[in-house]
């Protein structure tokens, strides 16, 4: 299950941002997850809940925005947003398409807290 290694890298990235911003904890992690990223949202959530327990993200909530597939057809120039995992142009049924969005997983935003000054 590659979601474990993905979450491990995500938490490491969160820890680096928290350290750079003198944060004591991360309360929210927002990611954009493309439908063609190869990452299963439910497994990612489970992995996050497991791996966050020992670090600065232990109280963090993982928020996922699912990004549909966006393609552009080289034949008819149609740009399409697709819910299914298909690279066929819905306008002309061409396979000559280019993926514009929906293949990656991106860290979009972190909410962090800093220690209160005494």
UniProtKB/Swiss-Prot annotation:
Mind telling me which Gene3D superfamilies this protein's record contains? 3.30.2320.80
* Presence of the UniProt keyword Zinc in the record: yes
Residues the record lists as binding Zn(2+):
73, 76, 89, 92
Query: GO terms for biological process?
Result: protein maturation; protein modification process
Transmembrane spans: none
Query: What InterPro entries would the database entry show?
Result: HypA/HybF
* Family, as annotated: Belongs to the HypA/HybF family.
Q: What does this protein do?
A: Involved in the maturation of [NiFe] hydrogenases. Required for nickel insertion into the metal center of the hydrogenase.
What is the recorded name of this protein?
Answer: Hydrogenase maturation factor HypA
Q: Which organism is it from?
A: Shewanella oneidensis (strain ATCC 700550 / JCM 31522 / CIP 106686 / LMG 19005 / NCIMB 14063 / MR-1)
Q: Which gene encodes it?
A: hypA
